[in-house]
């Protein structure tokens, strides 16, 4: 892990009046960049030339850093270019996937918003389970391997893969049949299979809850809630049951979009309690813990109990559903507030208070 002192030494050489907020052109970059501009920051996007159109048309980026391929962002010349523009990187799922988690931890020497040490706790299922379970949150039962399957389960794989390759099954035979099918299609590799994560299939309504923890205010804020729109499962459920059987299509769970939702108000105390517990436990496990945005993906069962099946330890894709504010984020100030602008506000306040060390790593 890059020492915090080394990152702070890099930041001390910056022109503090000309900080540039930067991210990779994908995932949640539109509201990250727009939010930064609304708070008076210069912005830059890292992109390939064929993916630059949205950032030009929407006018969210002041500068463009072009790469031949997104994995080039870990190269030293790109890092130096970022340092030369006094960059603070806002990481999202695509940034981590393209840069590589090992590089983020050990070689990417550009100041980054949030706690880069916690990103591995999201990526590795055992660490994620340790953090969620240790927080006292209700999580699905975990299975040690396919031979233990004794009922409906969901099979997942590590990394930010947007649900690709996930599948439900109910027996060890069905598990291996679907594994073979996905391997034949090139969706899964032997390495993926060795890291398969098998958990109880929880029946309930899906709520992806977006929080922001402010280390400057020591406060957990509810920013918004969304649901995923997934292919092909959301298309298959529109097909009558008898026709589904005839089609004999195994559903996939690839996230293609998101839509905003609100949760019944009587569940909000539970929502805030979950966020508070996770933040407290994260400080114990990987100090300074959750800094800035994070997400708890949950299912609400018929007993009105929220079961957390996954977390994001950085800005989650569902925050795109409230680029102009959510029914919850607007309650804090009465003004529209995106997650991107909330991040920029925290950076701005940290600079004003000379407490930037509290929000970057």
From Swiss-Prot:
Binds 1 Mg(2+) or Mn(2+) ion per subunit. ATP binds at residues 146-208, 230. The keyword Amino-acid biosynthesis does not apply. Mg(2+) binds at residues 297, 310. Pfam families: DUF1246 (PF06849), DUF1297 (PF06973). Signal peptide: none annotated. 5-amino-1-(5-phospho-beta-D-ribosyl)imidazole-4-carboxamide binds at residues 27, 94, 258. Pathway: Purine metabolism; IMP biosynthesis via de novo pathway; 5-formamido-1-(5-phospho-D-ribosyl)imidazole-4-carboxamide from 5-amino-1-(5-phospho-D-ribosyl)imidazole-4-carboxamide (formate route): step 1/1. Its EC number is 6.3.4.23. It comes from the Archaea. Residues 116-348 form the ATP-grasp domain. Belongs to the phosphohexose mutase family. NCBIfam families: PRK13278.1-5. Catalyzes the ATP- and formate-dependent formylation of 5-aminoimidazole-4-carboxamide-1-beta-d-ribofuranosyl 5'-monophosphate (AICAR) to 5-formaminoimidazole-4-carboxamide-1-beta-d-ribofuranosyl 5'-monophosphate (FAICAR) in the absence of folates. PANTHER family: 5-FORMAMINOIMIDAZOLE-4-CARBOXAMIDE-1-(BETA)-D-RIBOFURANOSYL 5'-MONOPHOSPHATE SYNTHETASE, 5-FORMAMINOIMIDAZOLE-4-CARBOXAMIDE-1-(BETA)-D-RIBOFURANOSYL 5'-MONOPHOSPHATE SYNTHETASE-RELATED. This is 5-formaminoimidazole-4-carboxamide-1-(beta)-D-ribofuranosyl 5'-monophosphate synthetase. It comes from Methanococcus maripaludis (strain DSM 14266 / JCM 13030 / NBRC 101832 / S2 / LL). The lineage of its organism: Archaea, Methanobacteriati, Methanobacteriota, Methanomada group, Methanococci. The gene is purP.
């Amino acid at each position: 892990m890059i020492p915090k002192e080394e990152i702070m030494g890099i930041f001390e050489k910056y022109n503090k009046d000309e900080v540039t907020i930067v991210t990779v052109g994908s995932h949640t970059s539109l509201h990250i960049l727009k939010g930064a501009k609304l708070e008076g920051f210069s912005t830059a996007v890292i992109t390939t030339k064929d993916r630059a159109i949205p950032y030009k048309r929407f006018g969210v980026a002041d500068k463009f850093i072009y790469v031949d391929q997104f994995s080039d962002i870990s190269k030293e010349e790109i890092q130096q270019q970022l340092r030369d523009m006094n960059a603070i990187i806002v990481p999202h799922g695509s940034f981590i996937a393209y840069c590589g988690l090992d590089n983020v931890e050990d070689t990417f020497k550009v100041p980054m918003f949030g706690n880069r040490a916690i990103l591995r706790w999201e990526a590795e299922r055992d660490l994620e389970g340790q953090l969620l379970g240790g927080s006292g949150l209700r999580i699905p039962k975990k299975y040690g391997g396919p031979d233990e399957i004794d009922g409906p389960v969901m099979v997942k794989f590590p990394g930010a893969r947007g649900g690709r390759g996930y599948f439900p099954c109910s027996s060890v035979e069905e598990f291996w049949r679907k594994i073979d099918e996905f391997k034949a299609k090139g969706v899964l590799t032997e390495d993926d299979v060795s890291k398969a994560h098998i958990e109880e299939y929880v029946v309930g309504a899906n709520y992806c809850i977006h929080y922001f923890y402010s280390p400057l205010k020591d406060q957990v804020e509810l920013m918004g809630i969304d649901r995923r729109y997934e292919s092909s499962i959301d298309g298959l459920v529109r097909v009558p049951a008898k026709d589904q059987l005839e089609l004999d299509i195994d559903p996939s769970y690839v996230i293609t979009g998101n839509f905003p939702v609100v949760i019944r108000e009587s569940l909000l105390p539970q929502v805030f309690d979950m966020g508070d517990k996770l933040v407290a436990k994260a400080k114990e496990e990987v100090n300074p813990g959750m800094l800035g945005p994070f997400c708890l993906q949950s299912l609400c069962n018929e007993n009105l109990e929220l079961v957390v099946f996954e977390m994001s330890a950085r800005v989650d894709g569902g925050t795109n559903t409230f680029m102009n504010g959510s029914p919850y984020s607007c309650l804090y100030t009465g003004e529209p507030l995106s997650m991107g602008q909330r991040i920029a506000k925290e950076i701005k306040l940290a600079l004003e208070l000379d407490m930037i060390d509290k929000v970057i790593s």
